[in-house]
Amino acid sequence: MNHIKKLYDWVLSWAASPYALTALFVLAFTESVFFPIPPDILLIAMAMGAVAKSFRFALICIIGSVSGAIVGYYIGNLAWLNSNGEFTGLANLFFNNIPGFTHELYNNIKILFDEWDFWIIFTAGFTPIPYKVFTITSGAFEMNTLMFIIASVISRGARFFLVAYLIWKFGPSIKNFIDKYFNWVALGFTACLIGGFVLIKYMI
């Protein structure tokens, strides 16, 4: 856990760097593929320091995150299984080094993807669920590429623009709320949204 804290602090240190915008893009990109620290923390720090640029920072986050998601998708699509249907060395590298990314989780996601692929990506992109797990598995399960990109743009856009809006609207005073409650609000909103669509589906 200590190494995660050090990584967290290292990411935050880029907020005051002349290369902060580049760091934000790279962080958002890599988090969609393998990096464990979400870009939100750097986005929040940068937006707090320049509130008027909050939406610009959010847009950079979105572009970086969706670009990384597409790379993750094609890693799953092209380099996840060999011709015999077995996991490649690259796949096992991810299983062995990304916390929480297990064979059991992979198999459970596979069952859900057949019916809920769009909503799975939306949920992973909008909530604190590890997005990288789903960008890769969506490619491995051959989710429709356009649908994957649309779900990623909508969910990542909603998440990062919402953070930017809260900071732009309320300023630094909103930071404690975002830190403590934003992920819970995101989870609750997503649960209600999906629940509503499920209810409509079974009523029609």
Range-by-range predicted roles:
Residues 1-26, 49-127, 152-204:
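Membrane-interfacial helix-loop-helix
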